[in-house]
Amino acid sequence: MQSLQHKASEWSGVPSDEAFAIDDTNRFLKLGLQTFINLSTNFYNRVYDDDEEWFRSIFADSEKQNAIQNQYEFFVQRMGGPPLFSQRRGHPALIGRHRPFPVTHEAAERWLHHMQQALDSTPDIDDDSKIKMQNFFRHTAYFLVAGNELKKQNEQMPCKHAAGSDNS
């Protein structure tokens, strides 16, 4: 079985080393807290105004301000800043936190579309950071898709310890 990282690289077209080049520079120190807040605000304004009802419905049970805060706190923490997300919400556990949502190839592409627009409309993000962030986001989106597909496969497999199974 291929690892989730391998699947993410295959499906996203972004090799792991390019995805994790995000760590070459402390993006939090380079960009600052307000830039991450602006990026997440730009992103979720687009998501909540999306023309596609199926995509908006993924976020229907989340308050926009909470979604913005969760995202920018995760980005800050992941990109070299203080552990804001973990202090408030615990371990990021991306696959587990996204488990209730339909994380499909189509949803990943729609998410990435909005993130690209948000990156392009956040002027304080330099070109090098933008490219590295795009690669990280693309790889991570498909990491979540791979995790979702693995979850579906596991749900379809009967448990060998299921009630009524013959263990003799």
Swiss-Prot record:
Superkingdom classification of source: Eukaryota
Family: Belongs to the truncated hemoglobin family. Group II subfamily.
Lineage, opening ranks: Eukaryota, Viridiplantae, Streptophyta, Embryophyta, Tracheophyta
Name of this protein: Group 2 truncated hemoglobin 3-2
Its job: Hemoglobin-like protein that exhibits an unusual concentration-independent binding of O(2) and CO. Required for general plant development and during nodulation. May promote shoot organogenesis from root explants.
Effects seen without this gene: Reduced shoots, roots and leaves size and fewer leaves, but increased number of flowers and small pods containing less seeds. Delayed nodules formation of smaller size.
Keywords: Heme, Iron, Metal-binding, Nodulation, Oxygen transport, Transport
One of the protein's GO biological processes: nodulation
Organism (species): Lotus japonicus
Subunit structure: Homodimer when ferric.
Residues that hold heme b according to the record: 98
Record's note on what induces expression: Repressed by cytokinins (CK, an equimolar mixture of kinetin and 6-benzyl-aminopurine) in roots.
Tissue expression per record: Equally expressed in all organs, including root nodules, leaves, roots, stems, flowers and fruits.
GO terms for MF: heme binding; metal ion binding; oxygen binding; oxygen carrier activity
Metal-binding recorded as keyword: yes
Keyword Heme: yes
InterPro entries: GlbO/GLB3-like, Globin-like_sf, Globin/Proto, Hemoglobin_trunc
